[in-house]
């Protein structure tokens, strides 16, 4: 969906997922985060099983905005995933946990724990 009216009409059908296209909404001058917030609040209030799938997320700022607004999940630009996996903190965290594992369990791996 790309407009608030589409979003609320679609929600009336109680779909499994509703996909507000965040980037397109914002490009049309709509506050995409507010639409997601209204959808999430309505779903909660009506106790619906519908999940908000924020679609076409282009950067980490948008990702944080849609999750803060109440999105249950999101579709991401592959470039965003690649960038996130190349953050310097990730290899550091992997080394930290790898070192902690080896200190506690030696060279045994999770696949050895059957």
Please provide the spans of the model-predicted regions:
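Active-site capping/gating regions of soluble enzymes
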Residues: 19, 45-50, 55, 64-75
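Active-site beta-loop-alpha junctions enriched in small/polar residues
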Residues: 1-2, 22-25, 53-62, 79-81
């Amino acid at each position: 969906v790309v407009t608030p009216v589409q979003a609320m009409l679609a929600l009336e059908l109680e779909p499994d997922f509703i996909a507000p296209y965040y980037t397109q909404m914002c490009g049309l001058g709509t506050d995409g985060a507010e639409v997601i917030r209204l959808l999430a609040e309505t779903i909660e209030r009506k106790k619906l099983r519908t999940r908000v799938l924020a679609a076409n997320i282009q950067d980490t700022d948008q990702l944080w905005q849609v999750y803060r607004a109440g999105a249950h999940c999101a579709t991401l630009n592959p470039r965003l995933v690649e960038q996130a996996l190349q953050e310097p903190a990730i290899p550091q965290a992997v080394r930290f946990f790898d070192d902690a594992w080896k200190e506690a369990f030696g060279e045994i791996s999770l696949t050895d724990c059957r």
